[in-house]
Amino acid sequence: MIVVQEEKNLLKAGVFAELTLADYRELEQAISKKLKAQRKLNLLLDLRKMAGFTLDVVWEDIKFTRSHPHDFARIAVITDDQWIPWLSWLGTAFTDADTQTFTDADAAEAWARGR
């Protein structure tokens, strides 16, 4: 399950349980809608309650990220999982966004907002 919140210069998404392709497509739609209103997007992903993801999500993420190489300014990822920072690092090959991982939600949100 995914919960997406739109704010002025930030799109926040929290993932609960397993991230499925349907969940990821919901995030894609929110991103695409937000990008129609602004040139670059700051994204905050809270993955602390994510229990895993399906393999089709990985492929969809690669395709989506490659189709938006210059559309993100900052991507903040909140996680306690040791593998997520590594996966985030791999994703930087497809985007010029400044990407950081955090364990503290407040620090992640402040950074994503540019503070």
Where are these regions (language model features)?
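Amphipathic, Lys/Arg-enriched alpha-helical "gate/interface" segment within cytosolic domains
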Residues: 1-115
